Amino acid sequence: MGNGMNKILTGLFLGNFKDARDVEQLHKNNITHILSIHDSARPMLEGMKYLCIPASDSPSQNLIQHFKDSIAFIHECRLKGEGCLVHCLAGVSRSVTLVVAYVMTVTDFGWEDSLSAVRGARTCANPNMGFQKQLEDFGKCEVHHFRTWLKDTYGESTFHDKDEAKQLLDKHKQQEAAESQNATSSGRQWNSHLTSLSSRSYSNYTTET
């Protein structure tokens, strides 16, 4: 959460409150637009274009109502060849939800694959359960209309979003496989250690006859 902003797609970055004030990082990544979503979201830096959404990290907080404005803000920035940073406080829940909704709209990914793709770039990404349910509902009811609206409004995309998202999704799957393998290996080592201790304990309490 504190290792700097992460690139999700060309021109789209995800980070935390600290990243949104890090002028060096912002300049390095050509950030000109900042989408800020947290309880006291407000513009902080001169020369930046802001979309500020006051919202709490509560499962009952309605974020779907902000998806269209957020998607348009991000997309218009990217079409200019500039960078957009989406952030909340920790860059874990609220901002991730908006970014996942955007990824769903510019690809044909469902919400789970879109979230996994985001996690491929930012491992701490973890929207609360209420936000995950909203993403699921968005995928069932609204995303198809949003894809049509985006195409009708901005034309055919020249980005390679699906390919970039697929690379992140594959990266996440590799990370999960490595973690699973490490956990299995650790479990075997622990079981071996317990067996060794048990054998020693038994030998200490037995005598030859």
Curated annotation (Swiss-Prot):
Chain segments carrying region Disordered: 169-192
The cross-references to SUPFAM superfamilies, in alphabetical order and at most eight, read: (Phosphotyrosine protein) phosphatases II
Q: Which Pfam families match?
A: DSPc (PF00782)
Record GO biological process = signal transduction
Gene3D superfamilies named among the record's database cross-references: Protein tyrosine phosphatase superfamily
Q: Name one GO molecular function term.
A: protein tyrosine phosphatase activity
Q: Where is the active site?
A: C88 (phosphocysteine intermediate)
Identify the keywords attached in UniProt to this record, alphabetized. Cytoplasm, Hydrolase, Nucleus, Protein phosphatase
- Protein's cellular compartments: Cytoplasm; Nucleus
**What domain of life does the native source organism fall in?**
Eukaryota
Cellular component terms (Gene Ontology): cytosol; nucleus
Q: Which reaction does it catalyse?
A: O-phospho-L-tyrosyl-[protein] + H2O = L-tyrosyl-[protein] + phosphate; O-phospho-L-seryl-[protein] + H2O = L-seryl-[protein] + phosphate; O-phospho-L-threonyl-[protein] + H2O = L-threonyl-[protein] + phosphate
Q: What is its main location?
A: cytoplasm
Domain Tyrosine-protein phosphatase spans what residues?
Answer: 4-144
**Composition-biased stretches (Polar residues):** 177-190
CDD domains from the entry?
Answer: DUSP22
What EC number(s) are associated with this protein in UniProt?
Answer: 3.1.3.16, 3.1.3.48
Q: What does this protein do?
A: Activates the Jnk signaling pathway. Dephosphorylates and deactivates p38 and stress-activated protein kinase/c-Jun N-terminal kinase (SAPK/JNK).
| Similarity-based family | Belongs to the protein-tyrosine phosphatase family. Non-receptor class dual specificity subfamily.
Query: What is the name of this protein?
Result: Dual specificity protein phosphatase 22
Q: Which organism is it from?
A: Xenopus laevis
